């Protein structure tokens, strides 16, 4: 795997995207632009449409209406450039760690798989079985499995939700460092607002199928845990999430 930084990630443009399940409107004419290489976190209450948005971008669902574009190209036409991680690492227990990383690949892929494992600190576990790994190590393997494809877009659906606090912080740092190195676009869905503001360039709140808050995280990297500014931004997002009344227009907070 070439570990040189990619020229850019996948730029995303959603135009009036809606998703309905019978009478249930999950996404409601949602408009969104994400520049190439941006790290975006999505927060919100359960059922607000966060995971549905990720599934649309992953090609696991199709929109009821609207366009999902990578620049000017339908995202579905370049779906091979998109990879997704879930809360469950989804490793095949009957395959070794390195075989899980190279799943579905053909040709001479083992050197690339070893490089991907080295990037996540698990090169020495290549020949082991998934059962021998901790939860955090399994998620590192899942991340390596995404990296080997050199994605333009990495979708993260609560990938750290089941990890202990220390392992979660280590994984946050790893994901951010790999994003900085490779330049892919990241969309992270999380229920943890502190995680969102610690990792992302931008935090979106989705409520009632629309964007209710669009917040730029104006803190340089590396970010210091416990900083006053991080706490202020976290409080701002939490306050908005907890509001019962909803304005017609999204609230934007930049810089």
Curated annotation (Swiss-Prot):
Membrane topology: Peripheral membrane protein
Pfam families with a match to the protein in the record: ABC_tran
Keyword annotations from UniProtKB, A to Z: ATP-binding, Cell inner membrane, Cell membrane, Membrane, Nucleotide-binding, Translocase, Transport
Gene Ontology CC entries for this record: plasma membrane
An annotated Gene Ontology molecular function: ATP hydrolysis activity
PANTHER family: ALIPHATIC SULFONATES IMPORT ATP-BINDING PROTEIN SSUB, TAURINE IMPORT ATP-BINDING PROTEIN-RELATED
The name this protein goes by in its record: Aliphatic sulfonates import ATP-binding protein SsuB
Species in which this protein is naturally found: Escherichia coli O1:K1 / APEC
Taxonomic path: Bacteria, Pseudomonadati, Pseudomonadota, Gammaproteobacteria, Enterobacterales
Primary gene name: ssuB
């Amino acid at each position: 795997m070439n570990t040189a930084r990619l020229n850019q990630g996948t730029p995303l443009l959603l135009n009036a995207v809606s998703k309905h399940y019978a009478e249930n409107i999950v996404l409601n004419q949602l408009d969104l632009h994400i520049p190439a290489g941006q790290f975006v976190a999505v927060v919100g209450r359960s059922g607000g449409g966060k995971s549905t948005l990720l599934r649309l971008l992953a090609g696991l669902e199709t929109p009821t209406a609207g366009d999902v574009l990578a620049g000017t190209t339908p995202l579905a036409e370049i779906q091979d450039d998109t990879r997704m991680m879930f809360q469950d690492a989804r490793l095949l227990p009957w395959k070794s760690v390195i075989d899980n990383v190279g799943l579905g690949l053909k040709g001479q892929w083992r050197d690339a798989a070893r490089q991907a494992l080295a990037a996540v600190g698990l090169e020495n576990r290549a020949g082991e079985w998934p059962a021998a790994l901790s939860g955090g190590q399994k998620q590192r393997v899942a991340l390596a499995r995404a990296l080997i494809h050199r994605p333009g877009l990495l979708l993260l659906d609560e990938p750290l939700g089941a990890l202990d606090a220390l392992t979660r912080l280590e994984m946050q740092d790893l994901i951010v460092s790999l994003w900085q190195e490779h330049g892919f676009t990241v969309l992270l869905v999380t229920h943890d607002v502190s995680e969102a503001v610690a990792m992302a360039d931008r935090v979106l709140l989705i409520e009632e199928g629309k964007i209710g808050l669009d917040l730029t995280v104006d803190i340089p990297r590396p970010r210091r845990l416990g900083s006053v500014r991080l706490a202020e931004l976290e409080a701002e997002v939490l306050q908005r999430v907890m509001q019962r009344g909803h304005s017609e227009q999204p609230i934007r907070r930049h810089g």
